[in-house]
Amino acid sequence: NMDSGLTEKELEKEVYASLPFRQAVVADIQRNWATNASGPINMGVREPNQFQGMLAVSGKQAVASYYSLFKQLAPELRVAMTYSRDEDNGTGASDLQAALKQAMQDYMTFYGTRNFLEDKDPQRAYLNDMTKRIARKKPYNKGNDDDRLDLIIVSDQLLTGFDSKFVNIIYMDKILGEGPLIQAMSRTNRTIDKIAKPYGKVRFYRQGAVMEEKVKDALVIYTKGGNDTLADAGNTPDDQGP
């Protein structure tokens, strides 16, 4: 329960950016991975590793930190990370670029891809390969388990515009407003069928009660035409027809 009277900024510093909190998030994802990644029951057994996930976190430093923790604590999961160039560079930018380069090296080595670092735009080439892999698009659509990527860690990248029916869950270690929240949740909502994937899942690690209200508000906004705030939705005339 985080109802401690601390501001969101204080919670970020004292709790959410702490190593024990992040270790607990990794442990929770690891503990529930088989359930969230398994497909429908086939001959009495759930097929493992049929679905992928995304972990959305607060800023580049958190992306790099979580990636390192997954490598240490959950090496059996195939995890990749990315962040965009236009996210706040701030202090430690060179360290963060080095962390991204190392993650790219890990990825290229594990999957035996070409060397993206030799491309004109290495980050774009890496992101393109990663999104194809997690969406199981050509050439990763043959059901070859060696091609499988389990989890992508992001800050802002891929929270809009990207979706895949194979992304079954988004884990949220960040607070989002209603508009961005609907966008992020929509990354998981492409269904397969009523048995394999009837709906996507979202798991919140920050202020569950607050986020529950935000989800309710976001759904009101969404049903009233996709405004960015609840106030905007309230100003939408109801007599406009469907």
Regions found by a protein language model. Name each.
Residues I192-P242:
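Long, hydrophobic alpha-helical segments
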Residues L77-E87, Q183, P198-A209:
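Conserved beta-strand -> loop -> alpha-helix junction used to position metal-binding or nucleic-acid-contacting
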Residues N36-P40, K71-L77, G143-D146, S164, ...:
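Secondary-structure transition/capping motifs at alpha-helix termini
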